[in-house]
Amino acid sequence: MKEIQVLEDLISEEMEDSDKYMDLALEYKESWPELAKVFYDLSIAESGHRDMLHTQVVRIIEKYRREHGEPPAPMMAVYDYLHKKEMSKAAMIKSK
């Protein structure tokens, strides 16, 4: 589905931005604590955006199930792959 691909691309962008901001927060933690806090807050905000987009992916899949039954296996395989990749990246960002 085109919508899922668009959302997955946006989720990936949000993850990259969250990671970038977290790296900057760590870089400036000692020398510029207030700036580091801004970067930390931006990282958290990007994670929130990611969660909002993911919720929409889940809703699209649920709607498809209600209207058509189980989604095609290839579609779910791609979703499962991307979801696992995103969750792994999110865990890595949180562990910093």
Feature-to-residue mapping (PLM):
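Non-heme di-metal
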Residues: 1-96
